[in-house]
Amino acid sequence: MMENFKHTTVLLDEAVNGLNIRPDGIYIDGTFGRGGHSRLILSQLGEEGRLLAIDRDPQAIAVAQAINDPRFSIIHGPFSALADYVAERELTGKIDGILLDLGVSSPQLDDAERGFSFMRDGPLDMRMDPTRGQSAAEWLQTAEEADIAWVLKTFGEERFAKRIARAIVERNREQPMTRTKELAEVVAAATPVKDKFKHPATRTFQAVRIWVNSELEEIEQALKSSLSVLAPGGRLSIISFHSLEDRIVKRFMREQSRGPQVPAGLPMTEAQLKKLGGRELRALGKLMPGEKEVAENPRARSSVLRIAERTNA
């Protein structure tokens, strides 16, 4: 039975407003979660509008299946495959907006059985979709020390990555870790300098979660796919929660807004320049939560919303 964990959608109005909803438009909510964004989008669509939602979390799918609306459909899978889902429905190049709310959701963090949080003892899992792939425990038990250190450094920006990786491997040799509390304790013991404002396991849990779920690769693939999926004038509205996510989104929007870069002085005909194509996107800026939203929902503090529009290129 699924527990009813509360989820407050971050930047709800801002993200949906960023899509510039047309009543008869076709939209994608690539991260359904508990449906906050989807329900608001549906409330702004007319009878001819359509919303395709995606999530790889079976609990999110269960929530979505309770929505009885002919304009709405839900897909169980990763949002990185959105181009395939759209092609199957013969909607390539016809999507008017894509919304992505990246990272882990509050219900996932708050449910100890999902294994995402060092604050709650539960199985060391961390998979967005517990039916597929390796759990965090399985990966940590089989990975090389150097690989664990690389993941902690790359995806957690953990300065004690090597020391923590060594402690994890040594502990797993003695007795394999299967609980979140065990990993949190090992990391805390291996961290020589503590941050008084942050639990020592924060960066390790983030890094392992990102690795287990291939989160950054998912984002990069979805962004790349969006260019073929969106109609001219279609919008991208993307919420990030940490610098690694935001860096990818920011770089993508900046590069696609600039268009092909031709070295100064390179002799090219007008036909050759035209063949290179123009700007794929027009960046429309970023928004961050206000003081009121952060006070009501502290998890919103680090969020950044970036919006871009597909050009006619």
UniProtKB/Swiss-Prot annotation:
Q: List ligand-binding residues for S-adenosyl-L-methionine.
A: G35, G36, H37, D55, F79, D101, Q108
Q: What reaction is this protein's catalytic activity?
A: cytidine(1402) in 16S rRNA + S-adenosyl-L-methionine = N(4)-methylcytidine(1402) in 16S rRNA + S-adenosyl-L-homocysteine + H(+)
Q: What is this protein called?
A: Ribosomal RNA small subunit methyltransferase H
Q: Which SUPFAM superfamilies match?
A: Putative methyltransferase TM0872, insert domain, S-adenosyl-L-methionine-dependent methyltransferases
Q: Which organism is it from?
A: Salmonella newport (strain SL254)
EC class of the enzyme, as a word: transferase
Listed GO MF terms: rRNA (cytosine-N4-)-methyltransferase activity
By sequence similarity, the record places it as follows: Belongs to the methyltransferase superfamily. RsmH family.
What does the UniProt keyword field contain?
A: Cytoplasm, Methyltransferase, rRNA processing, S-adenosyl-L-methionine, Transferase
Which GO annotations describe the biological process of this protein?
rRNA base methylation
PANTHER family referenced in this protein's UniProt entry, alphabetically? 12S RRNA N4-METHYLCYTIDINE METHYLTRANSFERASE, S-ADENOSYL-METHYLTRANSFERASE MRAW
